[in-house]
Amino acid sequence: MSTTKGKNILIVDDDEDLTDLYEAFLKFDGYKVDAFTDPLDALSSFRKDVYDLVLLDLKMPQMNGVELSQKLQNIDPNLLFRFITAANKEYIENLKTNNPDLEKNIIYKPLWLNEIRTTIHSLLYNNDQ
């Protein structure tokens, strides 16, 4: 069963090692993946209706994941995204002040690659229905 065929994922995380790992793992699973370590580069190359899922680090130097997700959603309002983060609770609580639904969109680091696989498959499968 090749449910990953044709699914496009965008990854934005300032940790290059993690970005490379996620990209290689997801490509091995059959996804088409674009990965960026700079949120501004990701934003400048983003196009509407290209990605089935966007995975964003929550805490990045140039622009946090919430800001980036808002800018991406201005381009593609139906965008499906999740934040992957190891940010501390205080940082997340501060972001939740203006984004009360933030918590339901967070995947916490560290995580196992199988967790990524299961979560992505669930998100994309449920989104197709």
Predicted regions and their residues:
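Hydrophobic/aromatic residues positioned on beta-strands within the core alpha/beta folds
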Residues: 82-86
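Alpha4 helix (beta4-alpha4-beta5 surface) of REC/receiver domains from two-component response regulators
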Residues: 67, 88-106, 114, 118
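Acidic catalytic/metal-coordinating carboxylates
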Residues: 37-38, 64-68
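Two-component/phosphorelay signaling modules centered on CheY-like receiver
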Residues: 16-34
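Active-site residues of response regulator receiver
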Residues: 57
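Receiver (REC) domain active-site loop signature in two-component systems and cognate sites
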Residues: 60
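Acidic, metal-coordinating helix/loop segments flanking the phosphotransfer/catalytic sites
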Residues: 35-53
